[in-house]
A protein has these predicted regions:
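Non-catalytic cap/lid and distal C-terminal segments of serine-dependent acyl enzymes
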Residues: 1-115
Length: 115
């Protein structure tokens, strides 16, 4: 499995190119090391070809929260509303860097990895 890795503002990014040059690309917000396991599991099901970009080293309570909010659980931290900044990082840096390493532009993009 061909793999390209890079960092963008502290986020770790792993790119697993699809077999077809214009395969769709899926951006997965995940934990370190999970991208390859997810890709392998999906390929075992016989799903259509796609490229996977696994983004990790996330601050879940900041990067995935659109606004400040109190902790959801007694022993967890508050949500700090950094989703807009993360979305900017994703669209302005991660996507261009990742797709610049692909053979051609993807047919479409998707995003996954958070409830």
């Amino acid at each position: 499995m061909l793999l390209h890795t890079f960092e963008a503002e502290g986020k770790s990014v792993c790119l697993f190119p699809g077999r077809q040059p214009d395969a769709p690309v899926l951006y997965l917000n995940t934990f370190p090391g999970e991208g390859e396991r997810v890709l392998r599991a999906l390929r075992e099901t016989g799903c259509a070809d796609f490229s996977l970009v696994a983004v990790s080293n996330l601050d879940w309570n900041c990067d995935m929260a659109p606004w400040d909010a109190p902790p959801a659980f007694a022993r967890s931290g508050p949500f700090t509303g950094g989703a807009q900044e993360y979305l900017g990082l994703l669209t302005q840096k991660i996507i261009p860097l990742a797709e610049g390493q692909l053979a051609s532009a993807p047919r479409w993009r998707g995003i996954a990895g958070y409830s």
